[in-house]
Amino acid sequence: MNFITGLVSVSFRPLSAEEIIKITKNAGLDAIEWGGDLHVPAGDLDAARAVAEKTRAAGLLMPEYGSYYRLGVSAPEEIDGVAACARALETDTVRVWAFHKGSLNVTEEEYLRAVADAKRICAAYPDLRFCTECHNNTLTDDYRANLRLIEDVAMENFGAFWQPNQYRSHAYNLESARALAPYTNALHVFAWEGNEKYPLAFHRDRWKEYLDIFAEKARAENVNLMLEFMHDNDPKSLGETARTLRSFIENV
């Protein structure tokens, strides 16, 4: 099973890159998704190279870059700085955001602008895979809208990240996982219900079902399981949370 465990660096924005590397290594995780807002700002190649060198020296992977490029919203030239940082990190996967409105609030012109932008960046950087954040108040706020976007972009290097929607039912999230699994190579892992955050073990049964769905993909290629925003926002809890995540994988 090719599940890669890791940490999303924005989970602990106050920490330095060096501190992020240390706690990730100490927790026994495999990888870090570096965020493009603080630890590796888009276009800052010096920062990207320095962070990449330190991450590799610690024996950690960098399977994805968490950019804040918004399809159809960001200035078109901003993708160049994003792509440059991804290459400096030697990752082939870049997280992007799908517009700045929910799927039911967007106009057709706005939607088509986001689709055209996705096509543009995928064509400009065929060596990179661009994956949308699965998030409310974007075009991926519902898995059916997410599928429509993937189908309308229709580029081989365009896909999705997945995470459970904390404001929807478990049944909905299972439907979402089944629908998006073929297009997904990274998951953001947490245990939330609405605005309440819980220890990851609280959703052990739910994550067993989610990982069973993504297991088929993980038999053929790497699927990244990236811990995001711990229940207590305390770096000291990362080790326990990482052990919980590994126990999930052992039972798939």
Question: What are these regions, as identified by a protein language model?
Answer:
Residues 1-93, 155, 159, 182-184, ...:
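N-terminal pre-domain/capping segments
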Residues 5, 31-32, 65, 122-207:
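Acidic/histidine-rich catalytic cores of soluble enzymes
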Residues 10-17, 35-47, 69-77, 101-106, ...:
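Acidic-and-aromatic substrate-binding clefts and catalytic sites of carbohydrate-active enzymes
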Residues 60, 91-92, 128, 216-224:
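A short helix->loop->beta-strand "cap" motif at the edges of active sites that frequently abuts
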Residues 91-106, 126-136:
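Active-site groove signature of glycoside hydrolases
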Residues 103-118:
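Active-site cleft segment of glycoside hydrolase catalytic domains centered on the general acid/base Glu
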Residues 186, 222-230:
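Conserved active-site loop/cleft motifs that coordinate metal ions or position small ligands
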Residues 200-225:
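P-loop/Walker A phosphate-binding loop and immediately adjacent motor/lid segment at beta-alpha junctions
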